[in-house]
C-alpha cells in the first residue's frame, strides 16, 4: 500500500516499528521505560526472526536513548543496600572476621540474617562491645551495620525503692558500638575497591541494569 508506506516514510524518526508487539509506536511511547531491557529483547527477537531496516532503526533508537552507564568509581556503595547480592556481603564478612560467615536476606521482614559457625577473637573481642546488660559481638554489630542502626544500650545507675534497676541510656556504650559499626560499613567500601576489575564490572553492570536503564 503506497499511501501507508509514504505515511510511514513521512513519520520517520517520530514512529518506530516494535517487532515485539508487531506494530508501529510513537517515539514517546516506544523510547520509554526500561529501554535497555527492551533493546535486549528486540535484539533476541532479531536473532531468531528475519528482519530488515525498520527493526534495525528501532533497535538503534533504543540503544542511543539508553542512559550513559555509570562507572564503578562513580557509584556510592553502602553496606546493606538491597540490590547487592547477599553472597557479596557473605564474602566481605568472611574476610572481615577471618572465618566463614553467611548473610541471608529475609524479604518478608526486610531484614538480614547472619550465621557464623565458628566465632573467633575478631568476633568475640576486636569487634565486640560489652554493655551493662548485654554483649554485642561482631556478628550482632554486623547485623546492625547491614540495616544501618545502632543498638539501644542502657545501664543501671543504682536501685529504686523497690530494688529495681534505675536504667539510663549508655551513651559510652552506644558511641563505642557506633564506632565499630562505622568501621564495618567503611571497610566494605574499601574491600570493594580492592576487588578485581572483573568483579567491579559485574557489580557495576548489575547496578546499571537495575537502576540506570530507564527513559521517562
Question: Whereabouts are the PLM-identified features?
Answer:
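Charged, low-complexity intrinsically disordered regions
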Residues: 1-205
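ASCE P-loop NTPase motor core, strongest for the SF2 helicase catalytic module
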Residues: 209-216
Amino acid at each position: 500500500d503506497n499511501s501507508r508506506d509514504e505515511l510511514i516514510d513521512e513519520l520517520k524518526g517520530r514512529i518506530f516499528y516494535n517487532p515485539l508487539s508487531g506494530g508501529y509506536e510513537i517515539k514517546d511511547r516506544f523510547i520509554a521505560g526500561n529501554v535497555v531491557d527492551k533493546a535486549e529483547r528486540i535484539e533476541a527477537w532479531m536473532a531468531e526472526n528475519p528482519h530488515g531496516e525498520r527493526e534495525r532503526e528501532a533497535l538503534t533508537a533504543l540503544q542511543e536513548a539508553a542512559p550513559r552507564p555509570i562507572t564503578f568509581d562513580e557509584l556510592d556503595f553502602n553496606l546493606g543496600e538491597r540490590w547487592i547480592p547477599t553472597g557479596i556481603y557473605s564474602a566481605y564478612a568472611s574476610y572481615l572476621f577471618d572465618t566463614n560467615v553467611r548473610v541471608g536476606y529475609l524479604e518478608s521482614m526486610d531484614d538480614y540474617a547472619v550465621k557464623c559457625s565458628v566465632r573467633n577473637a575478631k568476633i568475640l573481642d576486636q569487634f565486640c562491645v560489652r554493655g551493662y546488660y548485654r554483649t554485642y559481638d561482631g556478628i550482632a554489630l554486623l547485623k546492625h551495620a547491614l540495616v544501618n542502626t545502632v543498638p539501644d544500650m542502657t545501664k543501671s545507675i543504682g536501685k529504686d525503692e523497690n530494688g529495681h534497676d534505675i536504667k539510663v541510656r549508655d551513651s559510652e556504650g552506644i558511641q563505642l558500638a557506633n564506632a565499630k559499626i562505622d568501621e564495618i560499613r567503611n571497610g566494605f567500601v574499601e574491600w570493594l575497591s580492592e576487588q578485581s576489575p572483573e568483579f567491579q564490572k559485574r557489580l557495576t553492570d548489575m547496578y546499571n541494569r537495575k537502576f540506570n536503564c530507564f527513559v521517562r
